[in-house]
């Protein structure tokens, strides 16, 4: 059986990593050893931050809802409690969109929550 050298496979692997590292600064885009570490780390950041993004957006939505609901005379927690009491099922993304883009509709939702809390 003939001896198998791994030159072709190594070249393919190096090209794959260097292609993934395209656009990185300095040696990170040119030197295989450094590029490999940079690509691995980038993958870890991407994986982590896909989850962090969800937390960040939820926090942003809550901040926006709280700001607008305070302008209407309720705190965020009172608003959410009132919506639960009134059996109004709107997620935070929709509430935040209403708070930013349709203030009249948001005011109507807050009024429903207020009446549910009063009852």
UniProtKB/Swiss-Prot annotation:
A UniProt-annotated Pfam family: Ribosomal_L20
GO CC annotation, single: ribosome
GO biological process: ribosomal large subunit assembly; translation
One of the record's GO molecular function terms: rRNA binding
Keyword rRNA-binding: yes
Domain of life, source organism: Bacteria
Keyword annotations of the record: Ribonucleoprotein, Ribosomal protein, RNA-binding, rRNA-binding
UniProt xrefs under InterPro entries: Ribosomal_bL20, RIBOSOMAL_L20_CS, Ribosomal_protein_bL20_C
Keyword rRNA-binding in annotation: yes
PANTHER family: 39S RIBOSOMAL PROTEIN L20 (PTHR10986)
Record family assignment: Belongs to the bacterial ribosomal protein bL20 family.
Function text: Binds directly to 23S ribosomal RNA and is necessary for the in vitro assembly process of the 50S ribosomal subunit. It is not involved in the protein synthesizing functions of that subunit.
Protein name as it appears in the record: Large ribosomal subunit protein bL20
UniProt organism field: Cellvibrio japonicus (strain Ueda107) (Pseudomonas fluorescens subsp. cellulosa)
